[in-house]
């Protein structure tokens, strides 16, 4: 029994010990699990904090990016607004300038109309005065002894005529001077605008071209055996070839710029190739001529495009390119036409005309010069005929006629072309005139002035652009001097051809002489 109890007690003790051991293990596992749970909780908490922090950074970056885009957009819009505002200001200024110009023109028109009305009224008053004076004088002279009716009438008419001429001269001089002042002021403004806004290149043509060669041995090859090569060159190319002692150079001379340019290119190719013989010369001449014809067409098309003009007929375009090889008084015709086109466009724009049409007329005003080597007739008639054939604008045709005085300018654009042509052609150094023609023109102008009654002497000065006329003070009074100047100017316009204008100055000097004895 005791043994049983002892065994039972030992079993109970073993069970208790096992329970305690198991509990200890469970407690240890629980603690481990708890620590792991805490660690995971901390990790989750850290990750949550990190995620929150990253989220805040992303939000800040997004806000920064959005603000930057907003600022960029705002800056761009402000810049565009500023540009639009500046453009509107410029347009507004242009409109204001145009309005001011219109107001000035309106004032000038009103002023001219009032002056015309005043002149008309003064004329009526003068007529009435004239008639009343005649009646009064007739009544007085009827009672004068020793005078017949016819003699009295002649005396009265002579006095009235002298008085009327003096009054008319006074009125003409008054209004003419005022009109000249206003016109000169306006013209100076327009010309200043035109010349300041356009600065063209100066192009003067010579009568020779120089071809450089590597050595003087090539001169002999160009001459050829018994002069065969040089004879063929001169016959085919149509130029004079001068081979002298000038080192490393051959001179080509011709008044025809087109032939001279082709000849220069042909000889350059011959010298470069080395094969100089008659057959080769003819082949190269044909090839170079075809290339030049193509380049002429392209040159004309490029000029039309550069000026911003509407389509021009290909034949006229080709003639524009040919102007490059024409010259007038040493001035290149194409350079002159381009200069006139630009100046005419500016002048037309300043005076309320069509700028594009003025440019077109300016470019084509001398187009006939491209035909003068092939056809008979003046360049004015040839140019007008070719433009009529290809249905150019009537203003263009009128400008062609008007710039040499064959017709009156019928539009602002035609008048602008005439003014631009004078600006381009008459400026110092633009053209070279033959001395004989210059002297002949000066002599003709002086003779016209001397042919007038009461003129003692006349002198052409300032390169023939001014004529100073010395009047006899006993035969011509101050009022008559005004009329004489106008008569001389009108006769010069009708009989003398000249570029620009000629100023007529009538000088009358009165001297009172006495002697002390």
Curated annotation (Swiss-Prot):
PROSITE patterns: HD. GO terms for biological process: mRNA catabolic process. GO terms for cellular component: plasma membrane. InterPro entries: HD/PDEase_dom (IPR003607), HD_domain (IPR006674), HDIG_dom (IPR006675), KH_dom_type_1_sf (IPR036612), Ribonuclease_Y (IPR017705), RNase_Y_N (IPR022711). GO terms for molecular function: RNA binding; RNA endonuclease activity. Residues 333-426 form the HD domain. The keyword Membrane applies. Disulfide bonds: none annotated. It is found in: Cell membrane. The chain crosses the membrane at residues 1-21. This is Ribonuclease Y. It comes from Campylobacter curvus (strain 525.92). The lineage of its organism: Bacteria, Pseudomonadati, Campylobacterota, Epsilonproteobacteria, Campylobacterales. The gene is rny.
